[in-house]
Amino acid sequence: MTDQKVPNVIERPLPNGVIYDMSTVGRVRITLPESSTWLSGLHWHETHDEYLKVVRGTVRVRLGDSRQVISAVNGNQPEIKVPCYAWHEWQRAAPEGEEVVVIERIEPDDNDKAIFFWNLNGVILNSPKLLSDETSIVSRLPARLQGLFLDTWIPLNLFIIFRSLDNIPVFLNAPNLSRVSDQRLRSLLQKIHTVVSHLILLVALWAGWLLGLQPVQLKYTPGDAYATWKSRQVNFKKAA
């Protein structure tokens, strides 16, 4: 697939409407239109620090135990740092009001952020097309089985992407750790959450390996970005 066939700007419709702009290397510009219910989901990174810069509008951010509302006002565009292993998520502060624009970037800047969003959206937007593809076995399944297939296929592919591109979801978050006052209990619960998340993603990775699934696919990724990512993987394996 050529670069021209892989868009740098990807839009998903309401109610969880969002626009991902990967036009500038090293950052992803995320736009949330009015009334969007989009939520990043609670997660953490283990090999990257992340930076969230609020360019327009107001967002609600959870970072560790803190919850804050951050606005871009009068030309001020605040940026917050999300250190490795810090649980975090963000969304619009309110459904009404102007559109929200946030720039996400990571350090080290290896372009994994853009590759993550290209492939995440590729899976989410293209998997349902299998149902109408006459060459696909899935299109011949009964409607109930088609729904079951998508409910399994999409999360499986996403979990493989999460595992390989440093985006670890918090699957449990019960009880909410911020409400646990005992430090030893909180530490134990967080370790349990960490083990559960890694175990789920590892099982998904094994299942994906058996099925021949890849976290980064050329059909969803611009050719130059794919080649660079693939080269890094080869070099990493040689170094290991």
Segments from the language model and where they lie:
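Cytosol/nucleoplasm-facing, intrinsically disordered, low-complexity tails
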Residues: 1-11, 23-25, 91-101, 110-114, ...
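Short acidic-glycine-tyrosine-enriched beta hairpin
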Residues: 51, 63-89
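Conserved short histidine dyad/triad with adjacent acidic residue
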Residues: 24-47, 74-83
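Double-stranded beta-helix
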Residues: 94-185
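C-terminal non-catalytic accessory extensions
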Residues: 188-240
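Short, conserved beta-strand element in jelly-roll/cupin
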Residues: 44-61, 65
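A short, N-terminal "cap"/entry segment at the start of jelly-roll beta-barrel domains
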Residues: 1-39, 174
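Short, surface-exposed beta-strand-loop junctions and turns on beta-sheet-rich folds
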Residues: 60, 67-69, 97, 108
